[in-house]
Amino acid sequence: MVFSMLLAAALLHPGAAAAQEVKQIKLTEKQIQGYVGAAKDMTRLYAGANPDQPNPKVEAQAAAVAKKNGFASLDDYDNASMNISMIMAGIDPQSKKFTEPPEQTKKQIADLKGDKSVPEAEKKEELAQLDAALKNVKPVQFKENIALVLKNYDKLAPLMEESGSGPRPAD
């Protein structure tokens, strides 16, 4: 459950390969605006899609949406969207303060350990997944991306909620 929320935060649409490491890129204002322009169409295209069985027709339509919004390819869109999502997942909606991904994972571990409502077997499994994720999660490589996403937060937050990978809940 917690791990899937972390994964959902890193992956914006089902067309992206599950559990792949985010290729960190330096975001531009043009990419943010392109993402904003493409997000609703992408969410609509991938609604109900099976991520394990990509549909070539849907992928072609998604590539056209990406190109229409200034991306060289669907992969280019995916890289930008994953970087945006990774940062959005670390922003507290109330304070607008950013927490690096490793610190987010450490907090999830601490919260889960203290959560009495989660059955022990489930807790043990989720803690193992979070511990494994902690070994691989990396801080944001391009710190200027944080400021760029924060600048556009009010445009991005509703799009994240629509796609099901909204900003993390307030503490």
Segment roles from a protein language model:
Residues 7:
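C-terminal active-site/capping subdomain that shapes the small-molecule cofactor and substrate pocket
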Residues 10-12:
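Membrane-interface helical sensory segment of bacterial ECF anti-sigma factor regulators
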